[in-house]
Curated annotation (Swiss-Prot):
One of its GO terms (cellular component) is cytoplasm. GO terms for molecular function: 3-dehydroquinate synthase activity; metal ion binding; nucleotide binding. The gene is aroB. This is 3-dehydroquinate synthase. Keywords: Amino-acid biosynthesis, Aromatic amino acid biosynthesis, Cobalt, Cytoplasm, Lyase, Metal-binding, NAD, Nucleotide-binding, Zinc. It is found in: Cytoplasm. It comes from Geotalea uraniireducens (strain Rf4). Signal peptide: none annotated.
Length: 360
């Protein structure tokens, strides 16, 4: 089993990478001395596949296991579902000597993590991500929270897990669209942080699309290592960590405007990345060849690139409700060529939209 550590002093934690080793979860949790009672938060789809092996592993390690099943989908990442989780935690009698396991994708991880951060002023939690997007992004770094009708992730907290267990074999049961969505977040790291990793993805598209285990394990581990290096330097998004929002400013606007129902998160990010690449070129940060490479990779990964047809005013309203807006200015992430980035404050959002063909 391969391991990397997210180094955050007393909040440091390991990320374990493996293939077909969910049975190890119980012993890994026992090593962390998290307490004896655990609530596993999952959804019906993931639970049908993986709750039993997770439960058996935890029980065999001496834990008392409770199951919390919540609806599947981004539209349920809200205060109503969060209240249901609190109700179950209270009904089960979980105390500060208990912990939560988030078994699922990004929605489950975000909500279960936020419940852990706030229940009894904080109990430990463990991430067991079952989607590619969650494995390479949301399970690492401690961002937890829920959506508000006015925007995505407007309510939340930074709260680090005690460990993350990533088993790439669980991706075999992931729907194709969900899997491709995760490849968008993976590509993001290459575009703004690591040109060599971008080339690795570009050269191994077919292996990635076929879910080749060796290739996947290497790509997921590299993605997590890149994210961990950013989080270690800027845990609470005071500066550097904003690079991880590449493609997300426009992507979140797309999700908000479509009610979180038309696009998966990674699909919206892919649209945002395509537009960010065009904007970066227009602003002089990258070349047309760089933009062509980004758009080509997204195309090879079968990801959307075109903005849905909303008015400039609708896009501006959605973008200006984003948490990346500070003091009236929008902090926007531009790719500098491939493998590097710059962050600049944009006062005129309509200028960005015009570059994207909105409001010409």
């Amino acid at each position: 089993m391969e391991t990397i550590t997210v180094g955050l002093d007393e909040r440091s934690y390991p990320i374990f990478f493996n293939v077909n080793e969910l049975s190890m979860l119980g012993s890994l949790c026992a090593d962390q001395k998290l307490g004896q009672r655990v609530a596993v938060v999952t959804n019906p789809t993931v639970g049908a596949w993986y709750f039993e092996p997770v439960r058996e592993s935890l029980v065999s390690a001496g834990f008392s296991v409770h199951k919390i099943e919540v609806p599947d989908g981004e539209e349920y990442k809200n205060s109503d579902t969060l209240k249901d989780i609190y109700d179950w935690l209270i009904d089960f009698g979980l105390d500060r000597g208990s912990f939560i396991v988030a078994l699922g994708g990004g929605v489950i991880g975000d909500m279960a993590g936020y419940a852990a951060a706030t229940y009894l002023r904080g109990i430990p939690f463990v991430q067991v991500p079952t989607t590619l997007l969650a494995q390479v992004d949301s399970s690492v770094g401690g961002k937890t929270g829920i959506n508000h009708e006015k925007g995505k992730n407007l309510i939340g907290a930074f709260y680090q897990p005690r460990l993350v267990m990533i088993d790439v074999a669980v991706l075999d049961t992931l729907a194709e669209r969900e899997y491709l969505s995760g490849l968008a977040e993976m590509a993001k790291y290459g575009v703004v942080l690591d040109a060599e990793f971008f080339r690795f993805m570009y050269d191994n598209v077919e292996k990635l699309l076929s879910r080749d285990k060796e290739c996947l394990l290497a790509a997921v581990k590299r993605s997590c290592a890149l994210k961990a290096s950013v989080v270690e330097q800027d845990e609470r998004e005071g500066g550097l960590r904003a690079v991880l929002n590449y493609g997300h400013t426009i992507g979140h606007a797309v999700e908000t405007l479509t009610g979180y129902r038309q696009y998966l998160h990674g699909e919206a990010v892919a649209i945002g990345m395509a537009q960010a690449a065009k904007i970066s070129e227009s602003m002089g940060f990258s070349s047309s060849d760089d933009t062509e490479r980004v758009l080509s990779l997204l195309s090879k990964l079968k990801l959307p690139q075109d903005l849905p047809p909303f008015s400039p005013s609708e896009y501006i309203e959605a973008i200006c409700h984003d948490k990346k807006v500070r003091d009236g200015g929008l902090n926007f992430v531009f790719n500098k060529n491939l493998g590097s980035f710059t962050i600049a404050t944009v006062a005129d959002v309509s200028q960005l939209l015009r570059i994207c063909g909105i409001g010409e």
